[in-house]
């Protein structure tokens, strides 16, 4: 039985980048690829995400991670509405902050070694400049997809090959297997769930 005394909380921020009709996501590096129950390779993808260090602001945490992962600067854009997502349920929430309002807060529960952990991911709309200037670092791959492709990927049904055939784009120095499925992390799934892509 997991007791409340053993609960842990971690705070993350993520940056949602959109240029014209496409969203930008990172495919995690090969060490984090996994196979599903049918032996098919799954490539986790999500927004640029960072754990917030003690004394750090959301914007500085995002700035640090964007420079590390894709070598670009980022600016938070205030969202008109904010959503709270937990267990697949989406609720609009009131945020008193005038600046740096997130598009959504995704609460994820994990149990590891009899310890319950809650991750809170604050996802912000951001401006990261032109996609032409973006280059993946740290063995990640950048994928660009429109909302229709994101809907399919959020359900775990989009392969790398189909992404290319249907107008998506991959920027990478590593080869992504054509038949591998793009698998959503909470930040990319949250973008789909909060209605931004409906």
Show the residue positions of the predicted features:
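Nudix hydrolase/Nudix homology domain
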Residues: 39-43, 108, 112-198
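N-terminal strand-loop-strand
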Residues: 1-48, 74-78
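Extended cationic-aromatic binding surfaces that line active-site or macromolecule-binding grooves
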Residues: 18, 67-70
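Short, catalytically relevant binding-site loops at active-site mouths
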Residues: 32, 52-53, 82-85
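Active-site segment of metal-dependent pyrophosphate-handling enzymes
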Residues: 71-131
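N-terminal phosphate-binding loop and adjacent alpha-helix
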Residues: 51-61
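Hydrophobic alpha-helical positions that pack around
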Residues: 62, 66
